[in-house]
Regions:
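Core alpha/beta nucleotide-donor-binding catalytic domains of modification enzymes
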Residues: 1-166
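Histidine kinase transmitter module recognition
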Residues: 4, 36, 91, 167, ...
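AMP-forming adenylation/ATP pyrophosphatase catalytic core
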Residues: 5, 13-19, 49, 69, ...
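Non-catalytic, surface-exposed connector residues within folded enzymatic/regulatory domains
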Residues: 27, 56, 154, 158, ...
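Short secondary-structure boundary micro-motifs
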Residues: 97, 109-110, 126, 169, ...
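Alpha-helix boundary/capping and short turn/kink residues
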Residues: 104, 108, 130, 169-173, ...
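Mid-to-C-terminal catalytic subdomains of enzymes
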Residues: 140-177, 181-184, 188, 283, ...
Length: 309
């Protein structure tokens, strides 16, 4: 990336996050990054967990917190004027992500895996496997360090990395690349169906609170979206799945079970699906709507249409 950045007139800054969870080896990794950046003449910003408690919470073991911490650091870098953050995700990470999501339950959106870019973020190494990046380092005479937690099978991703992926590569040595290529195709299909799903939700939106049952009317008046159920029921099931995914994703991980629960709610036409302590979707009298515990305030004396939070 460094020679390419020079050709394109792009200034590089390295960002390293010390999670503080691995003691001496975490400090070793930080020292390694500092040495490499000093030798290559690259500016470096180092973050420690204590600096980011407000954004990421107190340090604790687990992939979710570590990822939240990293992206809190990246957001600070972006806020300081960096144009984009380039992460080091490879095609091997892409293959692991696909297998992990398929095992947990996912649809086309999840099968698209890690996107090559999104606002503020680039993933320039998705076209390479982990073995490719190591080969490049060897060719350039560069060393690397390995996070020892990647060698343990405590995490599901590591078990896939050490078990499922090698087994697949035993069937076809290009398995990692083929899985990553499938993600690219799934992403293109996902984008097309997402446009169809957006059009469906737009056409099904209700606009007049007076014609809606109580709970839906309260939702609409408080700024929550309301949809007529019939257009949703009549659409192609794949388009409906995509539409429901777009409703779940802003609230929580859009696992397949939540999509199925909402699809059943649309089909039955009455009831409620609780996504979190504060957010649920309700259906009654031909409409579907979203409720939030602190926004759907009923007028005094009016009855709720769905069970209380």
């Amino acid at each position: 990336i460094r020679p390419l950045a020079g050709e394109k007139g792009i200034a590089l800054t390295v960002c390293h996050v010390n999670h503080g969870l691995r003691g001496e080896t975490a400090d070793r990794d930080e020292a390694f990054v500092r040495e490499v950046c000093a030798r290559l003449g690259l500016p470096l910003r180092v973050f420690h967990a204590a600096e980011l408690e407000a954004e990421a919470g107190k340090p604790r073991a687990g992939e979710d917190w570590a990822r939240r911490l990293r992206y809190a650091c990246f957001e600070r870098v972006l806020a300081d004027g960096i144009d984009a953050v380039a992460t080091a995700h490879t095609g091997s990470d892409q293959a692991e992500t696909l297998l992990f999501r398929l095992a947990r339950g996912t649809g086309l959106h999840g099968a698209a895996g890690i996107r090559p870019s999104r606002p503020g973020y680039l993933r320039p190494l998705l076209c390479l496997t982990r073995a490719d990046t190591e080969a490049v380092c060897r060719a350039c005479g560069e060393r690397w360090v390995t996070d020892e937690t990647n060698d343990a099978d405590d995490y599901a991703r590591n078990r896939l990395r050490h078990g499922a992926l090698p087994a697949l590569c035993g069937v076809n040595s290009a398995a990692e690349r083929n899985l990553a290529r499938f993600c690219e195709k799934a992403a293109k299909a996902d984008e097309y169906f997402a446009r169809q799903a957006d059009a469906l939700l737009a056409s099904a939106r209700a606009a007049d609170a007076k014609s809606l049952p109580g709970g839906a009317g309260y939702a609409l008046r408080s700024g929550q979206p309301v949809w007529m159920s019939e257009p949703l029921r009549q659409t192609d099931p794949l388009i409906l799945d995509m539409a429901l995914h777009s409703l779940v994703e802003p609230v929580r991980d859009a696992e397949e079970k939540y999509i199925r629960l909402l699809a059943d709610l649309v089909e039955k036409g009455s009831g409620a699906v609780q996504l979190t302590d504060a957010v649920r979707f309700c259906a009654r009298d031909g409409v579907l709507w979203r409720e939030e515990a602190d926004k759907n305030i009923r007028r005094q004396g009016e009855k709720a249409d769905c069970p209380k939070f």
